Regions:
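C-terminal recognition in membrane/secretory proteostasis and scaffolding
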Residues: 2-58, 263, 291, 298-417
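Active-site loop architecture of trypsin-fold serine endopeptidases
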Residues: 28-34, 102-107, 128-139, 179-187, ...
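C-terminal cap/linker of serine protease catalytic domains
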Residues: 30, 65-86, 139, 208, ...
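Catalytic-histidine neighborhood of serine endopeptidases
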Residues: 32-34, 115, 119-167, 176-177
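A conserved glycine-rich beta-strand in the N-terminal activation segment of trypsin-fold
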Residues: 78-84, 96-125, 153-159, 187-189, ...
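Active-site substrate-binding loop(s) of clan PA
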Residues: 86, 112-114, 134-135, 159-161, ...
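Terminal peptide-recognition signature
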Residues: 95-97, 110, 122, 126, ...
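Gly/Ser-enriched beta-turn/beta-hairpin loop segments
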Residues: 151, 163-167, 178-181, 223-242, ...
């Protein structure tokens, strides 16, 4: 009998070389290259760049059925999803991604950033390392599959819009898809990841091991930390992540980490699978993900550019004081910092306005603001600035609170690879 289960043969795991640099409170040793990033989820050409899972055994392959479907289940996509429970909605917002790199194939996951069912259009967020390889470059063909429609006949062609190795985020675009028109594809709802607390319950949903959509559950272990990793192009990157203990595997890359309401709190990106470590997965926080997706679509869609554009104030900041606060609503504790300016770059837009020693209390860009209690509140927020944007900082200087305003110029914009 013909095996109707696989579109591609099992392929071995292409592993992106990744090293985590521990904080000074730990041993400070690097980890083997299999330990952290899901190197394109699954694999390419059986290349194995280090110790770890057997590339021909448990490494994730693409388990897309090869059924020759040419129609849709009666009424598919026509019912209201209002009655769908929060957990099940995550299956409608998460997708399987299969990439072809020449004669090689690899798989991962993604989430719907936006969906236009009438026209069959959508934007999808995934990890940059899902669609890019140091050896092969950008995937020459990207296919997307929906939950319950993971067969070759339902493949949806997707286009790379833009992305960033540094942030490990990419945006894909789908246009005029009959599958989307006849599906329950649903755009994700973003939670405020700045309000995520340790012990919060989470669900990881994605294409684990390339075997199709699945879900696991766990809790948040660390709400925000920074990993030093070797990215998709071989360069060293610093990636801000949250840590969680839900089981994730090769193929989960780019998939969603959700809260109990089915809202996105992060994009699953990495894990630690060393022999003496259990249940340490990492996701890029949803607040950062949304800012990156907006930036990429604004600067890259239907343009020659495919890189993130980031405005730089030209100031160096540090956490001069750190501590804890108690959330009055939940009773949870969370970390806070005093964010202090320690250096100002010559010729920057902040020169002559911001001073060394200023404590940044809040930042506003074009009238949209936020309180600053962590350093990343400033650095991440700058992704929303455009040429001509007005930035207002409220700072404490000499015991007084003052507002400082300046405008983003073209010279302040840098391309982030």
């Amino acid at each position: 009998m013909k095996d109707n289960k696989t579109l591609f043969n099992r392929v071995a795991a292409l592993i992106i070389v990744v090293v985590m640099l521990f904080s000074l409170t730990s041993c400070g040793l690097g980890l083997p290259i299999y330990n952290n990033m899901f190197g394109n989820g699954d694999g390419q050409n059986g290349n194995n760049n280090g110790d770890g899972d057997s590339p021909d055994g448990d490494g994730a392959g693409s388990n897309i059925g090869d059924g020759d479907f040419n129609g849709f289940y009666p009424g598919s996509g026509q019912e209201s999803i209002e009655g769908v429970n929060d957990a099940s909605k995550t299956l409608l917002t998460t997708v399987t991604i299969v990439c072809e790199f020449g004669t090689a194939a690899a798989a991962g996951s993604g989430v719907f950033y936006s969906v236009d069912k009438v026209n069959g259009d959508a934007y999808i967020i995934t990890n940059h390392h899902v669609v890019y390889s140091e050896d092969y470059g950008l995937a020459n063909e990207i296919s997307v599959y929906l939950y319950g429609m993971e067969f070759a006949g339902y493949a949806i062609s997707a286009e790379f819009v833009g992305g960033s190795v540094t942030y490990d985020i990419a945006v894909l675009k789908i246009e005029n898809s009959e599958v989307i028109k006849n599906s329950y594809a649903t755009q994700v709802t973003f939670a405020d990841s700045d309000k995520v607390r340790v012990f919060d319950k989470v669900y990881a949903v994605g294409n684990a091991e390339g075997d199709g959509m699945s879900a696991t559950e766990g809790i948040v272990s660390v709400e925000s930390e920074t990993l030093q990793l070797t990215g998709a192009d071989g360069s060293l990157i610093s990636l801000r992540v949250m840590r969680f203990d839900a089981a994730v595997n090769h193929g989960n890359s780019g998939g969603g980490l959700y809260n109990e309401k089915g809202q996105l709190i992060g994009i699953v990106s990495a894990k630690d699978v060393s022999a003496d470590v259990d249940n340490m997965g990492y996701a890029i926080p949803s607040d950062l993900v949304k800012k990156l997706a907006d930036n990429i679509i604004y600067h890259c869609d239907n343009k020659d550019n495919t890189q993130v554009n980031k405005a730089l104030m030209g100031v160096t900041i540090t956490a001069s004081v750190s501590g804890l606060k108690i959330d009055d609503e939940t009773g949870s504790v969370y970390q806070v910092e005093l964010v202090e300016v320690i250096e100002i770059s010559e010729g920057s837009i902040a020169q002559g306005k911001v001073q060394v020693g200023d404590i940044i209390n809040s930042i506003s860009i074009d009238g949209v603001g936020r309180t600053v209690t962590r350093m990343h509140h400033v650095t991440d927020f700058m992704l929303t600035a455009r040429v001509g944007s007005t930035i207002t900082l409220n700072v404490t200087r000499g015991g007084e609170n003052i507002n400082i305003t300046f405008v983003v110029t073209q010279d302040a914009i840098t391309l982030v690879k």
